[in-house]
Curated annotation (Swiss-Prot):
Gene Ontology MF terms: NAD binding; NADH:ubiquinone reductase (non-electrogenic) activity; quinone binding
Name the record gives this protein: NADH-quinone oxidoreductase subunit D 2
Catalytic activity: a quinone + NADH + 5 H(+)(in) = a quinol + NAD(+) + 4 H(+)(out)
Organism from which the protein derives: Stenotrophomonas maltophilia (strain R551-3)
EC code: 7.1.1.-
Designated gene of the protein: nuoD2
Keyword terms: Cell inner membrane, Cell membrane, Membrane, NAD, Quinone, Translocase, Transport, Ubiquinone
Amino acid sequence: MSHVHQAGEAFASSPAESRQEIRNYTMNFGPQHPAAHGVLRLILEMDGETIMRADPHVGLLHRGTEKLAESKPFNQSIGYMDRLDYVSMMCNEHAYVRSIETLMGIEAPERAQYIRTLFDEITRILNHLMWLGSNALDLGAMAVMLYAFREREELMDCYEAVSGARMHAAYYRPGGVYRDLPDHMPKYKESRWHKGKALKNLNAAREGSLLDFLENFTNEFPGRVDEYETLLTDNRIWKQRTVGIGVVTPELAHQWGMTGVMLRGSGIAWDLRKKRPYAKYDAVDFDIPLGKEGDCYDRYLVRIAEMRESNRIIKQCVAWLKANPGPVMVKNFKVAPPKREDMKDDMEALIHHFKLFSEGYCVPAGETYAAVEAPKGEFGCYLVSDGANKPFRVHLRAPGFAHLSSIDSIVRGHMLADVVAMIGTYDLVFGEVDR
């Protein structure tokens, strides 16, 4: 035994061994990781399970949208906006269209403004449902995703009804919207899964117009949000994964240029719909939900409350639109295309349409910045025109880029499993981050 003890002493006193130290190691999180939501790559410096540093690598979804817009007429870049934050399509369009309207000195008719307000809020619910389902799935709550996508499917049908597309709508146009709200809704067709009485029940709310469908939806949606809250709000595992995780202080939120839920979750009441009203937000009644602690759980509660407020706004817009028919495009034929009926009989209308969509129109020289309160934060478009039919410069202010920039300072000291919860509540979409 004494011999073994002496050998141990010799081992401990070896000069080579006494200089050894435990060093941190680096780990790649993404872009293949399912919680990276597409193309996020984080290089994490780890001390065991604790994160000491996070280095986000972006650009894997860079498509040069800002440069592409410089080679297209103003009205041909609306489709690019849909593909930035491809979960909040019409809100992106709204910022770009507003910037063109400001430079041209035109204003959309009142009905078009209400339609834009309506679809901005539909888009907000669509975004928050996608966020809720995917974030809950990342943390192990699979049922919530199935519930959230049930309602999301109905609102996607509203997109399809007005534009013909379920995602990339290109519905907002400078001077108004593409067309008025339809008097019918897409219906489910008989299939192996939907037939007989079940099919009839599915189509019961789709017999009337889009506004009738939305009126029915707004009556039912608060109960659906209650179901999400039943599954998550007091769920012990959900609270263990989110309470006290990823705390963003008000000072930090200001320093990093955060907007939207990231700012309001920290208790700062900044919302462009209230502070810088656009469209018809000054004519509708709604509240700004605020958090207290600035953690992942508070951001979840704020988004849940925002869905309820969006539902209130939609209800008010539907009531106004039902009572007030009118034009949805400005009577300025420099930007407004001719009607389809006119193009069948009038050669001049056909030529006008062709010139409008092939060459576009010249926008007076100048610069402007237009921003909207998108579901993820302040989405802004800085537009410079030199008087030609194409932008001289387009710069897009994506809220997700500022939020992702802060991730290093927020995740330090947390465990590896907490990264998933934090990335989830950042609500990142890399179409807008990388642009």
